Amino acid sequence: MIGAGPAGSTAAYTLASAGARVLLVDKAVFPRDKPCGGGVTLRGARLLPFTLEPVVEDALDRLDCSLRYRSRFRRRAAGPLAYMTQRTRLDHFLLLKAAEAGAEVREGVTVDAREVDARIVIGADGCNGSSAKQLGLGGGIVHGVALEANVPYDARFAHTMVLDLAVIHGGYGWVFPKGDHLNVGVGGNASEGPRLRTELRRLCNEHGIDPDAAVDTRGYRLPMRTPETTLARGNAAVIGDAAGLVDPFSGDGMYEAFVSAQLAAAAALDVLSGKAAGMEPYAAAVTRRIAPLTTAGWGAKRAFERFPRTAYALARLPPSFRALEKLLRGDLDRPGDARGMERGAMRLIYAVARAAA
């Protein structure tokens, strides 16, 4: 397992728990930080066989949303929609879980002359890693960009997911509360890179946050797969960000990291037991589980790019929020599974997405 982020550690945990011999390697020494909003939807957290409570810093049950800082609406869910964590703590926690399950962990290692024999290789070293290329996988990945920073804590934002849609073409701005600070950021299409710093300052100003108090300002890429992306070949596969498994609209990759890790682990166990000849069934499983959400994400992204007012007017409808709430909590597998008025709202949003295609 190359890379001990959420995807790599989850896959290592799953495999080791099933009795497989697993070597998990990473160039970093943990705990280490990663630029990321740090949110884990309840949908994602429910995938894990253990609780994330030890590293949760806030539980978000409120949505505060605007279109370019105007027409703001607020909604409150019946329960948590997402948990806020810091990657320093979350990733180390997941790594320790993998080690406790029996995975051999090697930190602070880079490519050198040592050789390791393995029946299966899984690349989980993120969008900046080299495993996909070395394994002849990946390709066809479209990148978005984001810029984030940390600012002093403000109780006004407790338990609240603040989203300012379309402040960046193809994306949004956010304010996420952590235990002792706020994470603020903006992200969108790669072409928006030169505007990110200016828009981050504006985001802060719009919410009464001092932009000069921002620290740890960092940029990063958001990898999004396309149908041309190869996820597996023979006894090799890529998962998580290394596979471009980031939602095109939300930019969330944590749910996809956990799902792809578990699907890859299941496929690997089939290979090890002789039930399968290679890891290709993993790619098919990703298509079944994640592709419908990815397709919906691309549709929502295009709708807000081309028809932002119409898309926003539909998104703020109470049935739309109820459908979103169920998706974030994992009570709906995909938007098309909505029923009643929620289904009607989703169909209207789909219609706008098709018109924007």
Residues covered by each model-derived region:
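Redox-cofactor binding/interface segments in oxidoreductases and associated redox assembly factors
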Residues: I2, G123-A124, V238
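Glycine-rich FAD pyrophosphate-binding loop
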Residues: A4, Y13-C36
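N-terminal Rossmann-fold NAD(P) dinucleotide-binding loop
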Residues: G8-S9
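N-terminal FAD cofactor-binding segment of flavoenzymes
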Residues: K27, P31-C65
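Conserved N-terminal helical subregion
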Residues: R46, D58-A59, D64-Q134, G140-A146
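Conserved FAD-binding catalytic core of PHBH/FMO-like flavoproteins
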Residues: C127-R201
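FAD/FMN-dependent oxidoreductases across multiple families
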Residues: A190-A276
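C-terminal helical "tail/cap" subdomain of flavin- and related membrane-associated enzymes
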Residues: A266-A357
